[in-house]
Amino acid sequence: MQKPLKLTFIADTHHYSKTLGTSGRQYELRSGSDQKCLAETGEIIDAAFEKIANSDTDFVLIAGDVSNDGELVSHIEFKKKLDRLAKKKKIYLITATHDWCCDENPRKFDGDTVSNDVETMPSFKLYPFYEEYTINDAIAKYETHLGTYSYVVQLSDKVRLLALNDDQNGKGRAGFKPKHFEWIDEQLKKAKDDGCLMIGMEHHLLIPHINPLITGGGTCVGDREEVITRLADNGLRYMFVGHSHIQHTDDYTTPSGNKLTEVNIGSLVGYPAPIVNVTVNDDMTLSYTVEHLEKFTLNGRETDAQPFLAKHCTDLVHNVLSCRDKEEFAARITALQANGGAVAKFFFAIKPLLKFVDGATVGEMYKKLKHLGLARGIDKEAVHEFYNTKITDFIDRLLLSAIDGSVVKYDRNSAYYRLVMSIVSIPSKLLKSNTDMKRLIFTADTILTGGKYNNQNETI
């Protein structure tokens, strides 16, 4: 009996060279504003690659954003890591917009200063640079207007990988230009004619996972329903993507009844450092299991990955909540890529709220809501159970659940679920005509329960 084909997917390694700076005020602001790590990426990638090298997987597939911001030095260092892994495993990857710094804002940090004087890798040099991990083995390839490539490789007699570069669709969004899409159509038809299962991999999402409030807009390809319908109706059943840094599985069924299932892979260098192991079954279904990196070596010491990464993730919220100074608040908001100066104009009103949320318990929050006449509908029994729990503990748990694909699931009858949902429902009651407020309820439900699929272990 033939051995099942085994694939390992990872995404968003965002390797950052330490030569670009790892200390100082500006670095701290940048590092503290992101769910994923920065200076620690090299050590995390090394540990993950060692784990994968010792596994029984046949192929390692990387879904884009391999570098932090396209810095040449980061690419050079990352390729050396690939070369070491390649001694034991076959690797295929795609690049994405961070790999050629599409926003033209590469940075290096030195104390209180940040500089853009950083050499980056232009898009047209990416695929020659990563040639042995991309188009060398391609049975078909397509060069985009950026000089990047989509390509097809034969993974086994009956399985092919459709590796798609979706950086630009020519209309200001991620996706594919018309001729590019025609090439994709041809490859899907050829795979069907040859009796092969085609597994897709691209960087941007086809489906707004969890809810469009979280992964809509620029997180997805442009004209996403048109794109996913065309792919599914032409025979593509599975797509693996990155970009959102969220671990989540969802599907879409076209008006013609064709279903495409998409697995969104979280960032390898952020909580919970997911490694998605996939087995291709005899009936051409896919079974996946998500592993999380347990340990990595940092500054010569073995570090427990999960608490370290979870703290780094939740700190981006705590860094804002702990602001008691207008200038610090503006700097933190700016680091989150928002207009800190404009928001800080209202700091006089925001500061008391930050202070309250940062220190208050569920019981104190309930009293405050009751005083404001907003406690109607809050589950009192659930409040009592979590009366002395800090609000920030709830925020942390929700954030981590959104990112890790609900490793911990909450029953809809549990006190935790009832309390969160009754609080989340308050804005929709105040703004009854606001669609986004109603979406917030469905978003919270998906985060707490995990949604339609088991995001950690499932056959699709």
List each language-model region with its residue ranges.
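Non-catalytic terminal accessory segments
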Residues: 1-2, 298-460
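Extended active-site neighborhood of metal-dependent phosphoesterases/phosphodiesterases
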Residues: 77-182, 256, 277, 286
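Active-site-proximal segments of metal-dependent phosphoesterases and phosphodiesterases across multiple
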Residues: 33-34, 168-182, 191-238
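Acidic/histidine-rich helix-loop elements
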Residues: 11-43, 107-111, 170-176, 212-216, ...
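N-terminal active-site segment of His-dependent metallophosphoesterases
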Residues: 1-75
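Active-site environment of divalent metal-dependent phosphoester hydrolases
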Residues: 16-19, 68-71, 97-105, 169-172, ...
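Active-site neighborhood of phospho(di)ester-bond hydrolases with catalytic His/Asp-centered motifs
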Residues: 9-11, 59-65, 90-97, 199-203, ...
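Conserved beta-sheet core of the metallophosphoesterase superfamily
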Residues: 216-294
